[in-house]
Each structure stands twice: as structure tokens, then as C-alpha cells.
Amino acid sequence: MKTRFKLTFPQNLIKEPVIFTMAKKYDIIPNIRRAKITATFGEMILELEGGEDNIQKGIEFISQQGVDVELVEGDILE
């Protein structure tokens, strides 16, 4: 299963390996489709591939870390 999300990172998480930790912990393959990172915030379109339960747990994990997560429906322009 592949699902896309828009992630918004607060300043204190920009340099933290949140995506790596989630992917490793929940056996998810992340694919960064688009990203914009500045000194004060980060925004990313992330495609996650894995089991439905694992993706759900991974999203809950990064949300608990302080990342704002929104489901992206439909196609993203490349």
C-alpha cells in the first residue's frame, strides 16, 4: 500500500531524524516527493509504502513527536 501525506515540521524538529526513526521502527519505505526546509519550518510531501497498520502506527508516531500530518488525496504534480 502507498499513501501520501503532507508533513509540516516545527523548528525544533527540522534537524531530527523523525522520518528515519519512523521508517525503521514500523518497517515503512519513505519516498520524499517534494520538500521545502527553512531555518524556521519544514514542509514535505511524503509517500509511505508498507502495511496499512504499519503506516497508521508510523503516522501516529510522528504526530506524537510534534509533526503536523495531513493525508494527500489524488495525484501530486511532479
What kind of region is each of these model predictions?
Residues M1-E43, E47-E78:
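Long, contiguous binding/interaction regions
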